Amino acid sequence: MTAKTLEKAPVSLGGFVHPLADSIYSVDELGTTLPASVTIYNDLGGHYEQINAGDGLINGDMSTEKRALDLAYSSTFAQPAGPRNQTFTYMGKFSIDSQYPGNWNPEGVINIVSAGILGMTQPSSASSSPASSVSPSHFSSTLSCTMAQNQADMEHIYSPPPPYSGCGEVYQDPSAFLSTSTCPISYPPPSYSSPKPNADSGLFPIIPDYAGFFQPPCQRDMQSMPDRKPFSCPLDSFKLPPPLTPLNTIRNFTLGGPGPDGPRLPTAYTPQNLPLRPILRPRKYPNRPSKTPVHERPYPCPAEGCDRRFSRSDELTRHIRIHTGHKPFQCRICMRNFSRSDHLTTHIRTHTGEKPFACDFCGRKFARSDERKRHTKIHLRQKERKSSSSSTGVSSSERGVATSICSSSSNQ
């Protein structure tokens, strides 16, 4: 809805019901300046005469002759100093049109009369028929109801802001934003002192709980705002991340906690749970002692008939795959499976043709380091043979010289 006014009114709609001061308009000036259609009544209790307020008369006379009466109004009207002897009538036309021109409401033309408290509603702007005279009490009740309804509708739009005693009431505490249900900040303080053993399996957790280290998203966003006031925050949430899991913890998790007889195997590697098969190719020297002492090899093979012991758990895991036949590494080219990752690496070189290992004597290249080592032994044997043959040749020549000297001396 848009409002069009014919006269500029510097006060709001709520200010029309206030009485005007007598010093603003005098009776003599009103008699000369107001149009003939506006009548000043001296008697408050008398009947009002008929008012002919056509659109053409109001639009023509009120817009031209009323310019001489434009005064600077203050925000509030002053109360009259003395008693009023005479009253006058002030008329204005407010045409309220809807947003679409086709939906014009004929009741949108409102005539507001202040000082005399006279209200009048014309049925249509095109009608110029004289209106019947009505009692002042009826107009007063109609105007009071209309103004009270309009003022109540516009108070929620133009209501002044609530007064604040200080700046602290305008800006809320940042901690109040964190008290919502979408961002809870009450977390139990985590502890990283020591891993808790499990009573059932005796295993230690190797992945710590990082929930206490990372802050909630709402709290992290609030700390990044420079406009907010700083607030106290507990220092427990700024804990340093826990260190990496030590090797002993990983070893205990893989093979179980150490017992009185040394490290024990997990339940998955026990002979009754794994289908351990004997090795098809036995060791070349089964009774040959190892260079590493027994106490430094605490991981024995659980398979029956296998006396192998290892100093590292990953070596034992790799060895157990020989008994179980597990081959987790697969070639993507020929789909062949291998039990060790290094075997898969060397196998892929057969497809690519890569030979990174070269012989130091002849320059021949090999795909595996053990092949180069085996080939190098051939050169070493040949070198030993040459050195042995040369040494035998020198010794035989020396013997021949010695025998010739002895024979010549005997002849003499």
From Swiss-Prot:
Record lineage: Eukaryota, Metazoa, Chordata, Craniata, Vertebrata
Family according to the record: Belongs to the EGR C2H2-type zinc-finger protein family.
Protein name as catalogued: Early growth response protein 2b
Primary localization: nucleus
Keywords, in A-Z order: Activator, DNA-binding, Metal-binding, Nucleus, Repeat, Transcription, Transcription regulation, Zinc, Zinc-finger
Zn finger region (C2H2-type): 299-323, 329-351, 357-379
Start and end residues of each stretch annotated as Disordered: 269-299, 371-412
Function: Sequence-specific DNA-binding transcription factor. Binds to two specific DNA sites located in the promoter region of HOXA4.
SMART domains from the UniProt entry: ZnF_C2H2
Single GO MF descriptor: RNA polymerase II cis-regulatory region sequence-specific DNA binding
Bias type Basic residues, positions: 374-384
Organism annotation: Danio rerio
A GO cellular component annotation in the UniProt record: nucleus
Low complexity bias: start-end ranges: 388-401
Alphabetized InterPro entries for the sequence: EGR_N, Znf_C2H2_sf, Znf_C2H2_type
Subcellular compartments: Nucleus
GO biological process: embryonic organ development; hindbrain morphogenesis; myelination of posterior lateral line nerve axons; regulation of transcription by RNA polymerase II; rhombomere boundary formation
Domain of life according to the entry: Eukaryota
